[in-house]
Amino acid sequence: MSSHTALPVEPLDVLIMGAGVSGIGAAAYLRRNQPNKTFAILESRERMGGTWDLFRYPGIRSDSDLYTFGFDFKPWTKAKSLADAADILEYLSEAIDEHQLAPFIQYQQKVISANWQSDKGLWSVRVEDGRTAQIRTVECRWLFSAGGYYRYDQGFSPRFEGSEQFKGQIIHPQHWPEDLDYTGKRVVVIGSGATAVTLIPAMADKVASITMLQRTPSYIINQPANDGVAAFLRKVLPAQTAYSLTRYKNAKITLAFWGFCQRFPKLSKKLLLWLTRKELPKDYPVDVHFNPPYNPWDQRLCSVPEGDLFKAISAGNADIVTDHIERFTEHGVLLKSGKMLKADIIVTATGLNVQLFGGITLHKDGKPVVLSETLAYKGMMLSGVPNFAFAVGYTNSSWTLKVCLLCDHFCRLLGLMEREGYNVCEPKAPEGVETRPLLDFGAGYVQRALDSMPRQGPREPWVMSMDYFRDVKLLRRGAVTDKCLKFTAVPNAPLHADVQLQQQGSRR
C-alpha cells in the first residue's frame, strides 16, 4: 500500500513493524507457513528496504555474502557474492512480489507505543500517520518487531571541537546528500568500520585525495566478489539446491573461522595481519594502521570485495592516518600529533545509535515495560511480555541467517497455539537467574546502549546465541514448548476472522 488504507479485519493475528529485510522475511514466512493468519506490515518510511533504502552513500553494499544474507526460501542467483544496495533492493522487491505482500504493507505509518491488555489478550498499538500526524489505534494478538536495531533518523555523531569553524561540508553517511559532488575534492573520512572501508575505494577515483582517519584500526579481510563453488553448483543443480548447499558451506566457514578466532585469539591475529601484509606494499606500516588493540571478532571484521581498499591504498589513491583528533579548523582536521589534514569534505562515519524495537514504548496493562529488567527468550521474546516477538540477527555472521530461524520458530509457535486452543504466550524467567548483557560485542554503538537493552541468561533458552547451527537445533528442530513458556486462553478473546465468519454462517 502506497498510502494509508484500512487494515484487514481487526484484531490482526500479527502486526509487523518494519518493511526491511526482517519484516519482509517475517511476512513471507507467515504467508508460507501460516496462510490463514491475518497480518499487516507498518513501515514508518516511504519505501520498503530498511537499511538498503535509507543509506545512499557511494559504494553501499553488504558485508556478508548474499547466499547467507538472503532468505533461505529464495535463492540468490546473481554472480556477485557481496551485493550492492540496488541488487539487494531488487531481491527484496522480488520477494514481496512472489509472496504477494504489497497489499499488506502500509507506508509512513510509525508505531509509537503498544499496551498489552491482559483482560482482552490483545495489544493496543498507537500508530502515527507520517503525512497527517493523526494517531490511530490498531489491535492485534501478536506484535512482531522487525525494525532492526538502530535509529533511522539519526546516526551517532560525537561532538568535535571547532566543527562550527570548518568551511567545508560535514556529512554523516546515514544522511548522504543526493546532489553531493565530490569530484576533485579533498575528503577526510572519520572512522574505521564497514562504512568507512566501503566509502574509501568507492570515492577514490574521483577525489583529489581521500584519507581514512581512524582512532583505532579494524581487522580488514579480502573477500572474493564471486563465489566459484556457488557458480559451479548453479550449473549442475537446481537453483534452490545449489543455493542451500552454498548457504550451508558459507555459514560453516564463517562460524568455523569465528570459533577459531575465539579459541586462538593470538594465532588468529597473526594470521589476519599476515594476510593484510600480503595485500599491501612491503614497506607499508601494517602494524600502525591494521593492528587493533583488541582480538579478532571482539568487534566485527570488515570485508572488502576483491581487496578494493587495499588496491586503492597501494595505488596511492587513498591514505590511512591513525591518530586522535585535536579539533576541526577552517580548512580541515588538526590531529593531536600536530599533523593537519586539509579537507573540503569531512565524512563522519562514526557509527550508529542503537534503538531496539523502533524506539516504541511498551506497556503491560498500562505499566511501562523496562527493557533492562527483561530477559531475551530464545533471542526472540521477552520475559514477562506476552505475545511479543522480535527479530535481531547475528553480529558474527549474516543477519538473515538468524532472522529466518526466528521467523520459522515463530510460525511453529503460532501453529501450536492454534491447535491447543491458546491465545496468549508469555516467557517466565526463573527467579534469581544470573544475567549478562544481551550482546557480547565490543562495537561502540552496542556498548553505548547496553544499559537500555534486555539482558540474557547463562543457559538456554535465555541465551542470545551467535551459533547458527546450534540455533538450527533449538529453533528449527527443537521443541516449541518448554517449562519457561506459559500458555493461557483468555476467555471471550476476539476470535480469528475466519472463525468469526464460520460461526456467523452456522447461526444462519
UniProtKB/Swiss-Prot annotation:
The answer on whether this UniProt entry bears the keyword Flavoprotein reads: yes
Q: What class of enzyme is it?
A: oxidoreductase
Positions bound to FAD = 22, 43, 51-54, 63, 111
Q: Which UniProt keywords apply?
A: FAD, Flavoprotein, Monooxygenase, NADP, Oxidoreductase
Question: What positions does the entry give for NADP(+) binding?
Answer: 61-63, 192-198, 215-216
What Pfam families has UniProt attached to this entry?
FMO-like, NAD_binding_8
Q: What EC number is given for this enzyme?
A: 1.14.13.-
Q: What GO molecular functions are on record for this protein? A: flavin adenine dinucleotide binding; N,N-dimethylaniline monooxygenase activity; NADP binding; oxidoreductase activity, acting on paired donors, with incorporation or reduction of molecular oxygen, NAD(P)H as one donor, and incorporation of one atom of oxygen
Q: Which cofactor does it need?
A: FAD
The Swiss-Prot or TrEMBL record describes its family as follows:
Belongs to the FAD-binding monooxygenase family.
List the PANTHER family: MONOOXYGENASE, PUTATIVE (AFU_ORTHOLOGUE AFUA_8G02570)-RELATED
Its biological function? Catalyzes a Baeyer-Villiger oxidation reaction, i.e. the insertion of an oxygen atom into a carbon-carbon bond adjacent to a carbonyl, which converts ketones to esters or lactones using NADPH and/or NADH as an electron donor. Preferentially converts short-chain aliphatic ketones like 2-decanone, 3-decanone and 4-decanone. Some acyclic ketones are converted not only to the alkylacetates, but also methyl- and ethylesters are obtained, indicating insertion of oxygen on both sides of the keto group.
Q: Output this protein's name.
A: Baeyer-Villiger monooxygenase
